[in-house]
Amino acid sequence: MDENQKKSLELAIKQIDKAFGKGTLIRLGDKEVIPVETISTGSLGLDLALGVGGLPRGRVIEIYGPESSGKTTLTLHAIAEAQKAGGVCAFIDAEHALDVKYAKEIGVDTDNLLVSQPDFGEQALEILETVIRSGAVDLVVVDSVAALTPKVEIDGDMDDQQVGVQARLMSKALRKVTGLLSKMNCTVIFINQIRMKIGMTGYGSPETTTGGNALKFYSSVRLDIRRIATLKQGENSIGNRVKVKVVKNKVAAPFKQAEFDIMFGEGISKTGELVDYGVKLDIVDKAGAWFSYGDSKIGQGRENSKVFLKDNPEVAREIENKILESMGVNDELITSGTDDSDDISGLDD
């Protein structure tokens, strides 16, 4: 590049900075690469599967799955973790179904949670944009895309055909907010539902998500959550075993998976993950039904081991740090509490 070209380029950069703000156009070599900031999901295994220690800040996230698979529970845990780190969170409850009592049990500070229950889709997305523009909110959850009903559909008759209105609404909203999210360092999580494709034949998945294709493209991370087992204690169901697959990941390698327990009335079982990953990585020793850490036995069976870790948070944190170190993740990237529920005897060996 000759001197005239360099001067022209510098002038162009100055004009762009003046018009749109300093730092709008930069040379990558002029600025140190900053590690991705994250919000923990509340699940150690899922944070590891995401590759960066949690959900990336300033991005669009989609969490989808069948009914009662744990979608809302996962987002409530993310809210709780963001609040623990001093963040402000908002919950746009388009389904009008937020269980405040359950949110409290999971660890959400409901007194300081911003909640909106919009009447129609346009209102919900206007609220979303306004909240993001404020620059004061760290995490927004929209529950759910399927419930973002366009106003024209609400005002119309039952037999009116409104083809593609919701998809166009979502596409317009995402075009407007995606750039804002990065600028304001705010993360938005869209909860979505699954539908079956009509007339699907041949190869490919018969499932699809609602709201058109825009959300698939704009999302930096897409998580597919499925219930794979019901956890029982005797005859009583006390939780679900779920599997989360990272279907799309723009900040790390995709297609990794994590499994964990969601206990009714408690949420994600943290100490259960510590036992599982501890054994998998040879940090916790397992001999028969007994689990031990170092020279000390921590319990007979998985349930008793979880109770021990719950009662001894310093040991739990030590095991967690060793797991993170073994997996090559900086423990500062993942910050979460050690509160947890008792597990079930049905999972004991």
UniProtKB/Swiss-Prot annotation:
Task: Report what the protein is called.
Answer: Protein RecA
Molecular function (Gene Ontology), one example:
damaged DNA binding
| Keywords tagged on the record | ATP-binding, Cytoplasm, DNA damage, DNA recombination, DNA repair, DNA-binding, Nucleotide-binding, SOS response
Q: Where in the cell is it found?
A: Cytoplasm
- What is the recorded function of this protein according to its Swiss-Prot or TrEMBL entry? Can catalyze the hydrolysis of ATP in the presence of single-stranded DNA, the ATP-dependent uptake of single-stranded DNA by duplex DNA, and the ATP-dependent hybridization of homologous single-stranded DNAs. It interacts with LexA causing its activation and leading to its autocatalytic cleavage.
Cysteine pairs forming cystine bridges in this chain are: none
Kindly list the organism's lineage: Bacteria, Pseudomonadati, Campylobacterota, Epsilonproteobacteria, Campylobacterales
Q: What GO cellular component term, any one, is given?
A: cytosol
Originating organism: Aliarcobacter butzleri (strain RM4018) (Arcobacter butzleri)
Which sites bind ATP? G65, P66, E67, S68, S69, G70, K71, T72
Primary location group: cytoplasm
The family note in this entry says: Belongs to the RecA family.
One Pfam family here: RecA_C
Query: SMART domains attached here?
Result: AAA
Q: Which Gene3D superfamilies match?
A: P-loop containing nucleotide triphosphate hydrolases
**Gene Ontology biological-process annotations:** DNA recombination; DNA repair; SOS response
